[in-house]
């Protein structure tokens, strides 16, 4: 009886970990000269809404001279592949 319960517990724990992945796509700018970029970054599960993700991403981006303009959306790992080409060098960089 203990083995099936343990197996189910492990499966549920692993499924919960996978579901907890959260990503945000965003637009940033840098002045002088004006440079605009689109990117994708992972954010913590607790910040998996556009407003909360903005609060997490803004300091990361600012430390490299970028100003966050907007967080377009938040999504799970299923949305990564379709955004990879558009994000280019800003794919999971920050």
Regions found by a protein language model. Give the residues of each.
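Terminus-proximal functional modules
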Residues: 2-94
